[in-house]
Structure formats: C-alpha cells, structure tokens
C-alpha cells in the first residue's frame, strides 16, 4: 500500500488510475440495478455549469453533495445515473468571444452573426470542457459518455417546442416594458441577475417652475438621484395624503431645459417623507415611475439609446453619456438659478453581473412569459409536500418568490443563444412561432425574416431535468426516470432556475421535476465575507485537491455542510480530513499486515469487544441511513469520523492485538471479524471518500462481492440488526472510559506509561461491580494497572485522582508519584495569567465603542479567544480543586 508521504505528495498519481478504471468498466453510466431496489431508478441532474466556467468552491461543495448521494444510491442497488452537461451561457460566452476577437483586432459586427456564432462554437470546442475535466478530478461519478449541452440539436428542438407551445397557448407575448438594460452588453438583464453596489451619491433638489404661480410660489422642488433623466419627465407626483400639495393636483409644471408642460398628479406610491414629497416621474427610465405612468396615463419618453447615450432632439445634451449629461444638466440648472441645493445620499445601484456596468432601466419591446397560470401549480406542489426543501425554511422563500413573480422577460439582444423562433412576413404582416425555419410566407408567399433576439439562458436551462432525458422526441426514455430524485443547488438561483424548472415541468410533463431540493450553504471566506478575486480571499479547489487529495477536500467540505445559510470555509477541516484518510489507511495497513494465513469465512462476534464493535457498526448503518435520507451531510461525516477514528482505529484494533497474537482459531476468528468490519466500514465511507476506500478495498484478501467498491452493495441495516447488543456496548463503553481516564491522569501528571498504577474501584451497585470485575484483566492490560479492590463501599485513598465511568469511580493512587505542592503552584500560576487575559478580553467585549467600530471578524476572533480562555480556566480550576483534595 502507498505510504502516507507518497499519498500526500502525489494524489493524482493514484487517484486518476482508479477513476479511469471505473470509467473503463462503464460504472458512470446508468448502472444495472440489483437487490430490493434493482427495479427502481435513481436519477439526478447536475446544475449545468457555464461552458465558460472554472471549478470554484461552490461547484466543489455542490458536486461533492451530489456525488455522495449518487454513489450511495448506486451501492443501494438503484439503476443510478447522474446526468452531466454544460450550459451555453449566452452572455458569458459572447463576452469571452468578443474579448478574443478584440485581441485579434476585429469585432463581431465586422464578421457578422453567422461567423460570430461559428466562433462561439469553436471557442466551446477549445475551452468548454475544462470544468468537466475538473469535475472528473474530484471523482464525481457522472455519466461522462452522454454529456449534454444546452445548444445541442436535440436540446435546441426541445427549447423551440416550449416557445412555440407557450406562444400558441397565449403564455408568450411581446410587450413594451421597462427592463434592466446593460449599455455595454446591449441586452436586457434579468432582475435576479443584477448585482447591487452601494454608491456614495447625491440628492439633487431641482426647482421646476409652475405654469401658473399658486399662492405666490413660482416653482416646486423635486429631489432626485438621477437629474439626467429629467429630459424624459412627463409628470410630477405627490401623495394624495399630503395636505401641502392637494391644491396643486391637476396643475402643470413647465419642465426646465425641455420646455414641456407636465401635470402634477397624486399617487399612493409617493412617500411624502422623502425629499420634498414631490417626485419627478420618468416612466421610460424607472420601473416605479413606469407603474405610476401606467396608472395615470403619462407619456413614455426614452431619452437614452441602447448605449445609454442621450438621443437626438435635446440640443447640446444629445450624444452625451449618462454621466456627461448629469454633469451638464446640473450645471444648466445652476446657471438658470433652478438648483435649490444638493445633499449627500448613499444608495444602491444595479450593475451588470458580467461587465459591472451600471444598468439602465429602459423602455423597450421584449418577449415575455405570462406567469400567473404557471406559478399557481408551481406553488401548489410545494405547499402540498410533493416537493420538499432541505433545510425546510427555504420552502417559504420559494413560495414568497413565486407570489411576487412578475411576467418574465425572455428576450436577449445577443447572437449566441437560442434564436427566438418567431417569423414575420415583410409583405402582408403575417407572424407566427414555427418549429421549422422558413423564408416564404405561408399566407402570401412573401419574404419572411426571423426575430433577431435570442432567448434568456434560463429559458433553455429550465428544461434541464426532462430535455436531457429524451423529451420531446423520446418520451419512453423519460418515463422510467422521471421525476428525478433530488436537486442540489445554491439559494441565489432558486427563483431564476428552480421555480422555472417546476413551472415548465408541470406544464409539459404534468409531473414535478424532482422530489427533493437541497439548498446548500454558500461557501464564504474564513472571515465570513464572500470570496472574490478583488478581496484576495478566494480559495482554489484545484489547489486544495493537490494539497489534501480529492478525498480530503470532499470530506472536509461535507463536515461543514450544516443547515446554516453560509459556510465559513475552514481549511483546518481539510487538514483533519487528510489526517483522517491517513488514519483509515493505517488501520487498513494494520489489518492487512495481520492477515497471513487468512481463510475467508463468516464473521462471528465471540468476545465482548467483538459484540460491541458489531453492535456499533450496525447502529452506524442505521444512523447513516437516517442522516442521508434527511440530507444531513455534516452528520454523515461526523459519524463516519467518530466510528473510524475513535471506535475502530483507537479501540477495536487495539483490543484485537492480543487475539491476533494468540494464534489458532482465536487468530483466525479475529482476522475474519476485522475484515468484515473494515469491509463494511469502507462501504459506508466510500460515497464521501471514494478514492482511498477503493484503494484499500482492492487490497483486501479473498473473493470479493464486487470487483470494485464503487458497485459493491450498501450495508443493509435490517440484516445487521441482529448484531445490536446493548449489554456489550455498556461493558466496552465502561472499559474505554476507565482506560481513557487513567491514561489522561498519566498524561496530566507526567507519569510514565511503564509505571504500573494501583487502582481502587467504587461501584454504584453489585451489578456494576460484577461488570467491572469481568473486565479487570483487559483494563489492566490496556492501562498498565493493578486493581486492588472493587466494591460498592470502597473508600477513596489519600493522594489519589479519580476518573468516572458509567457505574463506577476509579481511584488512581498517586502517592510517591506526584509532588502535589509543586503541581498546585504551577496550576495557580497558570490560572492567574488566564484570569488577567479573561479580564482584558471581557472588558474589551463589554465596550459598546469597540463593538460598534471594530471589524466584525475582529470582534468574532476576540469572542473566540474569550471562549477558549473560559474553557481553559474551568478545566484548570477543576484540576486545582482535585489537587487540593488529593494533597
């Protein structure tokens, strides 16, 4: 077996051959079922990463969760398949190719649409598989031989059918609405894809002259964060409850610079406490103004073009960018004596998630999906429990998102993507959505052209669970595998993707797309802040796999998957996981080194230690099944760690050594039991740590149930139930507690392991006394002790230390071994130092000034220090109290 040093230095050297062997055997496709689950399928779909993507920590966490689930299902006998694929990522890919062309000194406008799309396909061929290779490096058992792509011909056909069917059912329509427009990418952007950035800005108070002075006042004052949009103002709004302005409703304003007369009107949207209570209204450049304009029949005037440049008709302002227009218009108001005053004002602005340009609310003609009919059923299947969310709190978040969902803008002004299949006759005005391209009008024979826009990437990805399984062309392929078992994804796309998959699946298949939705935590930096290149706090999973191996990274991440919303990445967990993998490897090495002359056979728990180990193993299987079924992955990792490290490695292996040395049938029985426990435990650990477990499995002797652990059977909790033995658990638990306590006392006082210690035992009753006496020889061997007395009325000797176990108190005699005066002085000195530290940190953390001014991570760090000091003080004071009794 590979040494620990080699394993740490060259994980890929032994991980990749195992992966290649699994792949060559065909284990990554749909595996044949077996056992009681053999007739059932277990299918999951990977959230398709962008074809432009590189593996990041979110992928690493989510792919670990999914692979853990699919590997267990495969071992449970299901016909398991994890569907792999990538998303064409419209705007992301177009941005990448635009950048590549720019480096070559050309633009897409110069080469035209057809050649640009060819360039996108070329880019995908050259770079698009990077993330798939990285997913493979994690050991993910996806179906690599049937990789899907959201722009493949089969998938494109499904997308087209959805558009045509919804169009003909009246669910897709074209409308003139406000959208989030990126002037740099020159396309609409979804609300949920916009990023919000805090900006230190201003609130400009502008004077708008009244057409006819009222009460001697010649102007009204409006407050705005965007003076450049005043060119498109078509009204001034006030609250109908605002007594200051009731008499002005119905009057008009002379819009400065432009000279347009605009009405003063009342609308309940207006907050009379904000600014002056008068709101300039620009229906074409603000969604709230648009809504007020619709309610009050205001004119809609676009003052910017698609590049956010002022359009013609505005004199010297035409041709200016938004920022230039803002500066010039404020200067003009000041020159006219119409700039009342300016205040500092912090607010959030929306930016493009790709290029980070400020988005412009822009009135334009777009294609929309009417969602009211669709979202009703999508809510019902969650409310009635057909789809379950994990953690359960995300159910309400999903329902709230649906309740507030507005019609979905699905058109994008890009070239790379699914082109909208709408066709228009240039002669007679005929138009329709078609499944096949045409250049001739079916009505008049005139020339036909296709819509220039493409569909939102989320429009195509909403079909992912069923379009990847043969729909609509091969419904028989979909039938046995649908709905899929579960979906694991991030919270930020619950609306963008999860809800839309539910809506489209219910419409087109009349079934839910998945039964369970896992919303995994977002991986944050150790300081709790989002990981980002600009902050320099990002973590590269590829580097982590080099340092800790794929298993170390996977298990370390699973240990951190609690029900929390965010996961503060803790690299120490990966260190622990790597050490854990080495512990498992060392335990397996011990077993293998003691298998000379091994004869396979049925395991037989003969001793209390055997019965304890088999019982703990049986309980572990039952417990892991419950944790997996509840998607409690941290519990899975914690219980596996505790069993392997504490029970199997630290105790059962140690308890086995005497019997292995005995020879004969004792040795043979011990060998069979060790192999049985190790083999079963490897199966339980395999989904989380596939490489090291497979490596060890291949080295186990004897005929195997399966050629590879990956397709071996998952332990059956019902079959192992017979091994559960509470009495044996009670006995060995007492043994381990006493031995651990005695060893702790040795370590505390620096007593050599070779020094035999006298122990007096007080039992709580005769049963406990009898139980202890039955294990005296074992305890004495493990702890190097001489038990001088066991009784219910035993007295504690002078100069002794006590360790507690279930049903007994073991008094370890220390006379002649410990200088109690010296030990007491040492403890008092250490306690005094810690008390000073406690006072310092407690005072600091009780100071409101520090709490309000210090960075959150500093406060958190100091709280952790105080908690550690408190814990250490408690332990040292307990030791001092014991010393005082002993001395």
Where would I find each of the regions flagged by the language model?
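NTP-handling and nucleic-acid-processing catalytic cores
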Residues: 7-11, 15-20, 137, 141-142, ...
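Active-site neighborhoods of enzyme catalytic cores
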Residues: 1-52, 58-62, 89-98, 117-229, ...
């Amino acid at each position: 077996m590979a040494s620990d040093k080699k394993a740490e230095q060259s994980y890929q050297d032994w991980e990749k051959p195992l992966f290649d062997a699994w792949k060559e055997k065909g284990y990554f496709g749909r595996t044949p079922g077996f056992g009681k689950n053999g007739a059932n399928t277990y299918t999951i779909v990977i959230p398709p990463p962008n074809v432009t993507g590189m593996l990041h920590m979110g992928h690493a966490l989510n792919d670990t969760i999914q692979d853990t689930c699919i590997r267990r299902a495969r071992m449970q006998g299901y016909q398991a398949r994890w569907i792999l694929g990538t998303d064409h990522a419209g705007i992301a890919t177009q941005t990448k190719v635009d950048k590549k062309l720019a480096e070559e000194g050309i633009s897409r406008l110069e080469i035209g649409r057809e050649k640009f799309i060819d360039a996108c396909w070329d880019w995908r061929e050259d770079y698009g598989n990077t993330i798939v290779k990285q997913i493979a490096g994690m050991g993910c058992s996806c179906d690599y031989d049937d990789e899907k792509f959201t722009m493949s011909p089969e998938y494109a056909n499904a997308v087209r059918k959805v558009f045509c069917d919804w169009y003909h059912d009246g669910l897709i329509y074209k409308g003139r609405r406000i959208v989030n427009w990126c002037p740099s990418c020159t396309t609409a952007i979804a609300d949920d894809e916009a990023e919000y950035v805090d900006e230190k800005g201003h609130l400009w108070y502008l004077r708008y002259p009244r057409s006819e002075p009222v009460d001697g006042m010649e102007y009204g004052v409006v407050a705005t964060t965007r003076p450049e949009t005043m060119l498109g103002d078509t009204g001034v709004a006030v609250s109908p409850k605002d007594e200051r302005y009731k008499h002005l409703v119905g009057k008009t304003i002379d819009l400065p610079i432009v000279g347009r007369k605009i009405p003063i009107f009342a609308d309940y949207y207006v907050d009379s406490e904000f600014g002056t209570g008068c709101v300039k209204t620009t229906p074409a450049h603000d969604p709230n103004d648009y809504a007020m304009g619709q309610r009050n029949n205001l004119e809609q005037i676009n003052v910017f073009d698609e590049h956010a440049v002022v359009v013609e008709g505005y004199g010297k302002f035409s041709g200016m960018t938004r920022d230039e227009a803002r500066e010039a218009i404020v200067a003009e108001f000041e020159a006219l004596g119409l700039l009342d005053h300016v205040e500092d004002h912090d607010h959030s602005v929306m930016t493009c998630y790709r290029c980070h340009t400020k988005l412009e609310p822009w009135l334009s003609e777009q294609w929309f999906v009417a969602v009211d009919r669709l979202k009703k059923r999508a809510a019902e299947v969650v409310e009635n429990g057909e789809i379950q969310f994990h953690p359960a709190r995300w159910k309400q978040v999903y329902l709230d998102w649906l309740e507030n969902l507005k019609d979905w803008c699905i058109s994008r002004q890009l070239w790379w993507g699914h082109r909208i299949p709408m066709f228009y006759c240039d002669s007679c005005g005929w138009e329709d959505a078609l499944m096949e391209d045409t250049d001739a009008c079916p009505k008049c024979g005139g020339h036909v052209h296709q819509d220039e826009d493409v569909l939102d990437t989320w429009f195509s990805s909403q079909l992912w669970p069923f379009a990847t399984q043969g729909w609509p062309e091969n419904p028989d392929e979909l039938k046995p595998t649908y709905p899929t078992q579960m979906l694991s994804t991030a919270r930020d796309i619950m609306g963008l993707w999860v809800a839309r998959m539910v809506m489209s699946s219910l419409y087109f298949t009349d079934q839910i797309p998945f039964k369970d939705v896992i919303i995994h935590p977002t991986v944050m930096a150790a300081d709790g802040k989002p990981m980002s290149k600009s902050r320099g706090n990002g973590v590269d999973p590829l580097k982590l796999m080099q340092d800790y191996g794929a298993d170390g990274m996977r298990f370390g991440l699973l240990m951190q998957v609690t029900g929390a919303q965010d996961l503060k990445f803790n690299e120490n967990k990966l260190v622990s996981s790597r050490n854990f993998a080495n512990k498992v490897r060392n335990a397996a090495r011990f077993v293998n080194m003691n298998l000379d002359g091994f004869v396979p056979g049925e395991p037989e728990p003969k001793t209390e230690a055997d019965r304890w180990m088999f019982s703990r193993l049986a309980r572990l299987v039952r417990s892991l099944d419950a944790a997996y079924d509840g998607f409690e992955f941290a519990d899975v990792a914690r219980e596996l760690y505790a069993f392997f490290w504490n029970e199997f490695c630290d105790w059962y292996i140690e308890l086995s050594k005497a019997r292995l040395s005995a020879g004969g049938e004792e040795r043979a029985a011990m060998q069979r039991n060790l192999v049985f426990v190790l083999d079963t435990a490897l199966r339980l650990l395999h989904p989380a740590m596939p490489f090291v477990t497979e490596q060890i499995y291949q080295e186990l002797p004897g005929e195997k149930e399966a050629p590879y652990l990956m397709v071996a059977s998952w332990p059956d909790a019902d079959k192992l139930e017979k091994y559960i033995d509470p009495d044996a658990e009670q006995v060995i638990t007492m043994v381990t507690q006493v031995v651990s306590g005695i060893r702790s006392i040795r370590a505390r006082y620096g007593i050599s392991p070779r020094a035999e210690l006298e122990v007096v035992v007080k039992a709580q009753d005769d049963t406990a006394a009898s139980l202890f006496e039955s294990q005296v020889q074992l305890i004495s061997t493990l702890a190097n002790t001489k038990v001088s007395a066991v009784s219910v009325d035993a007295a504690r000797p002078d100069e002794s230390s006590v360790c507690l176990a279930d049903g007994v108190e073991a008094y370890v005699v220390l006379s002649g071994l410990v200088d109690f005066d010296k030990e007491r002085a040492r403890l008092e000195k250490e306690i005094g130092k810690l008390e000073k530290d406690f006072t310092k940190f407690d005072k600091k953390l009780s100071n409101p000034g520090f709490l309000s001014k210090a960075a959150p991570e500093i406060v958190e760090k100091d709280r952790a220090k105080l908690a550690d000091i408190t814990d250490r003080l408690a332990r040292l004071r307990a030791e001092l109290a014991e010393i005082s009794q002993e001395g």
